Amino acid sequence: MKNKNNKLADCPYITLEKALGYSFKDKHLLEQALTHKSCKLALNNERLEFLGDAVLGLVIGELLYHKFYQYDEGKLSKLRASIVSAQGFTKLARAISLQDYLRVSSSEETSKGREKPSILSSAFEALMAGVYLEAGLDKVRKIMQNLLNRAYKRLDLEHLSVDYKTALQELTQAQFCVIPTYQLLKEKGPAHHKEFEMVLYIQNQMYATAKGKSKKEAEQQCAYQALQKLKGIK
């Protein structure tokens, strides 16, 4: 593993914990949450990611339930899906500069793995699972409320519920008179923890690949990447 931009080497946890608003009692648990499976170490963050997915789904659902009392079940589900996603968790992870602390293999480092939404969002889930195991749901609620306020200028359906696939299709139809196509590249993992990798083509040219916990999530990630390329967003 390279040490470039890996703050575990020089300032292990203080800055990250300050940004998070929580200091881990068990630093090994924190380190595990930051360790991607590519490192081939005895402990990585996959199990914590599994737990964090469930914890965050509950906490965010509860926060939205109380905040948006006027929304029906359909609107609440749509809003939650915008946050409880690879793109949503990546946004929250970047709010605390989590990418700077990830432990990834040399090959992932070379391919900018620490910036990949699939890796970054999974690490965020693992990190919050660690907080839950040490401090419980109340602490997770408090942290998530702070992070949501920090990461989003406005937390409502209009500003959060973005359908990247539809936005991309409208753009490609206007510019190229074609619609994007999506293809399943890989499916792996047990039934309770599937990971799907999709590839997106525009005019038979590959524009993006992305992973997600469902085909729909992976397709949204692909569409988001393609929109960035087409609009020239860095």
From Swiss-Prot:
Annotated residues for binding of Mg(2+): 49, 122, 125
A single GO molecular function term of this UniProt record: ribonuclease III activity
EC number(s) from the headed UniProt entry: 3.1.26.3
Catalytic activity: Endonucleolytic cleavage to 5'-phosphomonoester
Keyword Manganese set for record: no
Record's keyword terms, sorted: Cytoplasm, Endonuclease, Hydrolase, Magnesium, Metal-binding, mRNA processing, Nuclease, RNA-binding, rRNA processing, rRNA-binding, tRNA processing
Limits of the DRBM domain: 163-232
Subcellular location: Cytoplasm
SMART domains membership: DSRM, RIBOc
GO process annotations (BP): mRNA processing; regulation of gene expression; rRNA processing; tRNA processing
Broad class of enzyme this protein falls into: hydrolase
Ranges where the RNase III domain occurs: 13-136
Function: Digests double-stranded RNA. Involved in the processing of primary rRNA transcript to yield the immediate precursors to the large and small rRNAs (23S and 16S). Processes some mRNAs, and tRNAs when they are encoded in the rRNA operon. Processes pre-crRNA and tracrRNA of type II CRISPR loci if present in the organism.
Subunit structure: Homodimer.
Family: Belongs to the ribonuclease III family.
Annotated protein name in UniProt: Ribonuclease 3
